[in-house]
């Protein structure tokens, strides 16, 4: 049987087409194969980087000083505790350095890794000099980022919450300002081994988020950066410092302390306008205002640490207390002179009562009447021609009017003391002058921002 030439040609054409398609599929790798190749290359690069790597040794050991560049992004600042003299800050802390042992060549220029790789390489032993407590966030995984470029430069970022010490000078409280420092550096490496530098210019090395302030009693004015050397018994260390400048808001204290003190002083001066005879009312005014000032003084100190010096608020309360107490002493003085009679225009004279003249009286029908004496003369010889005088007569009483002096002119009682008149002017005037000097002095004073040098 003989095959037809047409069928044979068609068969050969199909075979040729299939072989061509098959060849193309083998020549172009699929997407899965391409991803598999990248993963393999990535794994080989990491294995090669860690092959013979000793993370106990710093980069450039014995050859050069390791330079660590840092910058900080503040996500949240506050709160600030005056009583404990500390503040809380939440930051993204970035460090960058170069490690020639981690150079690589491959299809990618940057290796983006997580915290697992960070534990296998050398990282700076940075700590916060004035930190009381620092927390590295671990939810849901450790908040750490590591990037390695092909030239061996590393970027290491972590999220931290730091509670740091903020030394405060409260002489100007509550018109005070503070510079809260954040100081960090290497714990074990001296400046001959590891030095720190700011990544960018000072204005951009520390950035605070626009909505990062968590302050109720302060305004965050800005931040400044600096660096220095600290000498300790184990050597000289580089210390990086950031100062956060804070200005206290006075509104809360005006409402809570200053206005009540001013109103209490004014209330104590109301007693000068009361009559000096109003002893109970003026006593209540004096005692009540003194007790009120005592209560305000105690409550104002509760929110502050127990410092050995007087603050601006202490001086204000002390002067207000002196005004209130002086008003009470003024009333005591007025009352003293009133009782002695020196506050009258003239002394009061009480007219003497006329003395009654006693006459011999006899009682007749429950009435008393003066009587005359009966005389019976005896004449010698008993001459009957002579009349015997024996007469008894009742004499009508005459009213005896006592001698009266013309009444003295009535003295007018002066109920307003000269001391009260003087106090009505002197006390408000002196208190106004004090307020003018006080507020002009403290509101225009330049705050002294001091920060102690850290010690290791």
Curated annotation (Swiss-Prot):
Carbohydrate attachment residues: 38, 138
Activity: how regulated: Allosterically activated by benzodiazepines, the neuroanesthetic alphaxalone and pentobarbital. Inhibited by the antagonist bicuculline. Potentiated by histamine.
Top-level taxon in the UniProt lineage: Eukaryota
Coiled coil feature spans: none
GO molecular function, one term: GABA-gated chloride ion channel activity
Signal peptide: 1-27
Transmembrane segments: 254-274, 280-301, 312-333, 422-441
Disulfide bonds: 166-180
SUPFAM superfamilies assigned: Neurotransmitter-gated ion-channel transmembrane pore (SSF90112), Nicotinic receptor ligand binding domain-like (SSF63712)
InterPro entries assigned to the protein according to its UniProt record, in alphabetical order: GABAA/Glycine_rcpt, GABAAa_rcpt, GABBAa1_rcpt, Gabra-1-6_TM, GABRA1_ECD, Neur_chan_lig-bd, Neur_chan_lig-bd_sf, Neur_channel
Main location: membrane
This protein's GO CC annotations: chloride channel complex; cytoplasmic vesicle membrane; GABA-A receptor complex; postsynaptic specialization membrane
Keywords, comma-separated and alphabetical: Cell membrane, Chloride, Chloride channel, Cytoplasmic vesicle, Disulfide bond, Glycoprotein, Ion channel, Ion transport, Ligand-gated ion channel, Membrane, Postsynaptic cell membrane, Receptor, Signal, Synapse, Transmembrane, Transmembrane helix, Transport
Family: Belongs to the ligand-gated ion channel (TC 1.A.9) family. Gamma-aminobutyric acid receptor (TC 1.A.9.5) subfamily. GABRA1 sub-subfamily.
Function comment: Alpha subunit of the heteropentameric ligand-gated chloride channel gated by gamma-aminobutyric acid (GABA), a major inhibitory neurotransmitter in the brain. GABA-gated chloride channels, also named GABA(A) receptors (GABAAR), consist of five subunits arranged around a central pore and contain GABA active binding site(s) located at the alpha and beta subunit interface(s). When activated by GABA, GABAARs selectively allow the flow of chloride anions across the cell membrane down their electrochemical gradient. Alpha-1/GABRA1-containing GABAARs are largely synaptic.
Entry protein name: Gamma-aminobutyric acid receptor subunit alpha-1
Naturally occurring in which organism (per UniProt): Pongo abelii (Sumatran orangutan)
Taxonomic classification: Eukaryota, Metazoa, Chordata, Craniata, Vertebrata
Gene from which the chain derives: GABRA1
């Amino acid at each position: 049987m003989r095959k037809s030439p047409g069928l044979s040609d068609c068969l050969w054409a199909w075979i040729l087409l299939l072989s061509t398609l098959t060849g193309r599929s083998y020549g172009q790798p699929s997407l899965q194969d391409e991803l598999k190749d990248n993963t393999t290359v990535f794994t080989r690069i990491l294995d090669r980087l860690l092959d013979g790597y000793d993370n106990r040794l710093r980069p450039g050991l014995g050859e050069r000083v390791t330079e660590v560049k840092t910058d900080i992004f503040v996500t949240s600042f506050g709160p600030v505790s005056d009583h404990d003299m500390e503040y809380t800050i939440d930051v993204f802390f970035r460090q960058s350095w170069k490690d020639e042992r981690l150079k690589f060549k491959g299809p990618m220029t940057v290796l983006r890794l997580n915290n697992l790789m960070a534990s296998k390489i050398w990282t700076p032993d940075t700590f916060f000099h004035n930190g009381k407590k620092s927390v590295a966030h671990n939810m849901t995984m450790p908040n750490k980022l590591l990037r390695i470029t092909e030239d061996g430069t590393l970027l290491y970022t972590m999220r931290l919450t730091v509670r740091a010490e903020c030394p405060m000078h409260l002489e100007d409280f509550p018109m005070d300002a503070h510079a809260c420092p954040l100081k960090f550096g290497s714990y074990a490496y001296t400046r001959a081994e590891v030095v720190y530098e700011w990544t960018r210019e000072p204005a951009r090395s520390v950035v605070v988020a626009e909505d990062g302030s968590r302050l109720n009693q302060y305004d965050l004015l800005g931040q400044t950066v600096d660096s220095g050397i600290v000498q300790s018994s184990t050597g000289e260390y580089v210390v990086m410092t950031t100062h956060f400048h804070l200005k206290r808001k006075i509104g809360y204290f005006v409402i809570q302390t200053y206005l009540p003190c001013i109103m209490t002083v004014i209330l104590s001066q109301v007693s000068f306008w009361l009559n000096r005879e109003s002893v109970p009312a003026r006593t209540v005014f004096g005692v009540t205002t003194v007790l009120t000032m005592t209560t305000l003084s105690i409550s104002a100190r509760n929110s502050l640490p127990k410092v050995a010096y007087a603050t601006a608020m202490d001086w204000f309360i002390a002067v207000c207390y002196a005004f209130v107490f002086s008003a009470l002493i003024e009333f005591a003085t007025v009352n003293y002179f009133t009782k002695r009679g020196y506050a009258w225009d003239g002394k009061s004279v009480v007219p003497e009562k006329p003395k009654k003249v006693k006459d011999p009286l006899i009682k007749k029908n429950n009435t008393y009447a003066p009587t005359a004496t009966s005389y019976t003369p005896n004449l010698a010889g008993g001459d009957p021609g002579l009349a015997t005088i024996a007469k008894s007569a009742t004499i009508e009483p005459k009213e005896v009017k006592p001698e009266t002096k013309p009444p003295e002119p009535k003295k007018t009682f002066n109920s307003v003391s000269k001391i009260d008149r003087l106090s009505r002017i002197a006390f408000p005037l002196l208190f106004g002058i004090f307020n003018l000097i006080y507020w002009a002095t403290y509101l225009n004073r330049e705050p002294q921002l001091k920060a102690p040098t850290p010690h290791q």
